[in-house]
Amino acid sequence: MFVRFLASKDFCGVDLLGAVPTVACWRLASLPRYLAEEDVERLIDSCNRSAAIGKRDRAILLLLARLGLRAGDIVHLRLHDIDWQNGWIHVSGKNRREARLPLSKEVGRAIVSYLQNGRPKTTSDAVFVRSRAPFRALASHCAVSVLVDSAIRRAGIIRPGRGAAHLLRHSLASSMLRHGASLQDISTLLRHGSIETTQIYAKVDVTALKQIAQPWPEVPLC
């Protein structure tokens, strides 16, 4: 990219582009970072359920940890997106791909607790709003990440990598896989456009990997 820039500015010849070696870049080469199941529960339990902001944060954490919502999904969630009668939550994610996810009693009760006893009076139709005036929708996905990061530090958990809100999404997928869920099930819940995106989680299923690991001479299996 830098050499192309130099060539466009006539600082070097175009023929020099062919002298720059191509660096291999493998798709899905990295490992997804996730929290252990007990750490996810500690994270959720760190919220002060008697305080308004604690009710809000707990409901958000449960949506991230139980349904795999993205930070942007939380920001754009509106009151009319929740079908209380039938127990569904409507989410419009990446590329405006809409999905209907089951609303469990645990998550539903947490949201109700916030709406009835924690959410300030406001004309905004956003489910989750700022805890201080002006009471409007959260500004961006960054606000959700800050919220999760604060909960991680409050729970005394060492974060395994970069990112905060997405960490709970990875944790859910990894937990589902370890408990026997198929990649197709995980792909459906996480609303991946292709199951190929979900396949990266197969790398963290150590139990399954042990079953297919080939023995190496003079080296015992894991």
Enumerate the language-model features and the residues they cover:
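Conserved catalytic core of the tyrosine transesterase superfamily
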Residues: 1-222
